Amino acid sequence: MGSSKLKRAIGAVKDQTSVGLAKVGGRSSSLTELEIAVVKATRHDDYPAEDKYIREILCLTSYSRNYVSACVATLSRRLNKTKNWSVALKTLILIQRLLTDGDRAYEQEIFFATRRGTRLLNMSDFRDASQSDSWDYSAFVRTYALYLDERLDYRMQGRRGKKKSGGGGGGDGDSGEEDDHRGTSNDIRSKAIVVKSKPVAEMKTEKIFNRVQHLQQLLDRFLACRPTGNAKNNRVVIVAMYPIVKESFQLYYNITEIMGVLIERFMELDIHDSIKVYEIFCRVSKQFDELDPFYGWCKNMAVARSSEYPELEKITQKKLDLMDEFIRDKSALAAQTTKSSSKRSNKSEEEESKTEYIQENQEDLNSIKALPAPEQKEEEEEEEKMETKKDVEEVVSRQDQEGDLLDLTDEAGVTAGTVGDSLALALFDGVVGTESASGPGWEAFNDNSADWETDLVRSATRLSGQKSELGGGFDTLLLDGMYQYGAVNAAVKTSTAYGSSGSASSVAFGSAGSPAASMLALPAPPPTANGNRNSPVMVDPFAASLEVAPPAYVQMNDMEKKQRLLMEEQIMWDQYNRSGRQGHMNFGQNQQQQYYQLPYSMGPYSYTPRY
């Protein structure tokens, strides 16, 4: 307790010293009285300032703009020197009262005034270290000064906007009427001017966004001014809270008015503006949730009348969800429309490019001009070339018709088609006809030729090359094949086969006869017909394949067949030895008895011949 009394005494001494210095300063009486009134309104005690000193300051500064500047300078020195939270808070309360009830010049002077190189109301570095429990008071001083600074900035921007719009109220200042009752004696004419701000419903959306942003920032500064700790029960703090709580009521009304306008325009706004509105509503919802308990504390502390507090309309989460859903649907629809518009634009661009291309082609076609007529020399040269080509073709055709009588290869008469036909006939039973090597192949007699006698003789000399065809489309190759069938079979029978052995009288045909022949041996040359070597008998061209050993499964089948034939032959010889009869009649009668008297044991294998 002794330390607190000592501090109070020291504070009282400082106040008396400041008053004495103001009296001895040698200034005018008005400035001296103004400085003394400021010192008395901001004493070092824990009691609120008396209202008479504040009214005296307002009265002294209402005469001249110089007194306003002197008052602001005195307040700046007071804030700069003091380290006591009570003096600093009382000075801020005086500034707030001057801004509200004083002349407009206070706003400009305080707005442009500096303290330690910064703005006058920038108290972020303030700290009272004189007491251990002064931290809560220092924090309230800092937040209170920050609120006043933000409020002053908001009002100055509103005034600048009004000046730019020519006084038509297009700025973001306070709504309602503003009377110039705070004007000085030099502004008597301006007192009659009543400035009306533009209604929010008539503002543009961008200006509404700008204004609500400033109001939300100012409301955040007010919410930060809620005292904590020991500052909640201090009388000076409660007196400082009263004016800003009254101002917060107007802030709430302005924000709700803007919210109503935004809700009306929400359906017509773009997606970008709709997102801004959604963000504004989310922020306002959080601010109203914090404002409700703050107003409850203010009511309990009797900061203002309970009837003066507004009824807060909170923004529910359901409303925010509806807004979010609407924005999502609108963005999805916009995306679809942009895709369709892009497709249409692409199609239109393609059509335009096609039309441009067609127009360019038409222009090119229209720009084509007739070429000049060719000269007579070129025509004569072309005619000479054509004549030389015709002469060469005639010489070549004559050589083809005459042929070379000494040519033994007969290349003139043999073509690729005839060679292919001869090779194909060699695979079958036809005799390849050989033409005479005396000249070209046979051609039909030309009746239109001039030298018909020589042509007749030439055609008669090549009668052997004619293709004789009988009437009715009968093929001579078929007839020759019928006559040569026996000779071909004889040649096949006489040809050697793989692994042939046995007697000539063996019933197993092909298993006995000629001795075994060597594998991969070509057959003997074909026999001639009637000793004429020029007319050979055709033999199977694939006879050489019989000399090659077949696969294993083919040889097994052949061996089984030979075994069955050998069994039949032995049965027939046994029957002949017993009864002396031959033929198949006796064989059929004794078939059952002969089966069990087989001299050879064949195992489980049994065979019944079928005739």
UniProtKB/Swiss-Prot annotation:
Keywords: Coated pit, Cytoplasmic vesicle, Endocytosis, Golgi apparatus, Membrane. GO terms for biological process: clathrin coat assembly; clathrin-dependent endocytosis; pollen tube growth; protein localization to plasma membrane. It is found in: Membrane, Clathrin-coated pit; Golgi apparatus; Cytoplasmic vesicle, Clathrin-coated vesicle. CDD domains: ANTH_N_AP180_plant (cd16987). Residues 386-401 have a biased composition (Basic and acidic residues). Residues 158-184, 337-406 are annotated as: Disordered. InterPro entries: ANTH_dom (IPR011417), ANTH_dom_sf (IPR014712), ANTH_N_plant (IPR048050), AP180-like (IPR045192), ENTH (IPR013809), ENTH_VHS (IPR008942). PROSITE patterns: ENTH. This is Putative clathrin assembly protein At4g02650. It comes from Arabidopsis thaliana.
